[in-house]
Amino acid sequence: MPQLDTSTWFITIISSMATLFILFQLKISSQTFPAPPSPKTMATEKTNNPWESKWTKTYLPLSLPPQ
């Protein structure tokens, strides 16, 4: 029974892995990806509410002035 010659397996496996790595890198680098989303500037409108022009103070039940 002849013995299997495994002396070339190492270089074959390494060269196959290097070739696959290069092919995948070329395939990935040729694809175009969408740009990352940029934040949208929102202009807030100032509304005139009647309670904004007045100053009101809310008293809690325990903080009422003494009578």
From Swiss-Prot:
Please give the chief subcellular localization of this protein. Answer: mitochondrion
User: Can you say what this protein is called?
Assistant: ATP synthase F(0) complex subunit 8
Q: One cellular component GO annotation, for this chain's record?
A: proton-transporting ATP synthase complex
Q: Which family does it belong to?
A: Belongs to the ATPase protein 8 family.
**Role description:** Subunit 8, of the mitochondrial membrane ATP synthase complex (F(1)F(0) ATP synthase or Complex V) that produces ATP from ADP in the presence of a proton gradient across the membrane which is generated by electron transport complexes of the respiratory chain. ATP synthase complex consist of a soluble F(1) head domain - the catalytic core - and a membrane F(1) domain - the membrane proton channel. These two domains are linked by a central stalk rotating inside the F(1) region and a stationary peripheral stalk.
> Which residues are modified to N6-succinyllysine?
54
Q: Does the keyword Transmembrane helix apply?
A: yes
Q: Where in the cell is it found?
A: Mitochondrion membrane
* N6-acetyllysine modified-residue sites: 54, 57
Q: How does this polypeptide assemble, per the annotation?
A: Component of the ATP synthase complex composed at least of ATP5F1A/subunit alpha, ATP5F1B/subunit beta, ATP5MC1/subunit c (homooctomer), MT-ATP6/subunit a, MT-ATP8/subunit 8, ATP5ME/subunit e, ATP5MF/subunit f, ATP5MG/subunit g, ATP5MK/subunit k, ATP5MJ/subunit j, ATP5F1C/subunit gamma, ATP5F1D/subunit delta, ATP5F1E/subunit epsilon, ATP5PF/subunit F6, ATP5PB/subunit b, ATP5PD/subunit d, ATP5PO/subunit OSCP.
Output the Pfam families linked to this UniProt entry. Answer: ATP-synt_8
Membrane topology value: Single-pass membrane protein
Alphabetically, the GO molecular function entries are:
proton transmembrane transporter activity
Q: Tell me, what is an example of a GO biological process annotation in this record?
A: response to hyperoxia
By its UniProt entry, which InterPro entries does this protein fall under? ATP8_mammal, ATP8_metazoa
Indicate the transmembrane segments per the record. 8-24
Give the UniProt keywords, A-Z.
Acetylation, ATP synthesis, CF(0), Hydrogen ion transport, Ion transport, Membrane, Mitochondrion, Transmembrane, Transmembrane helix, Transport
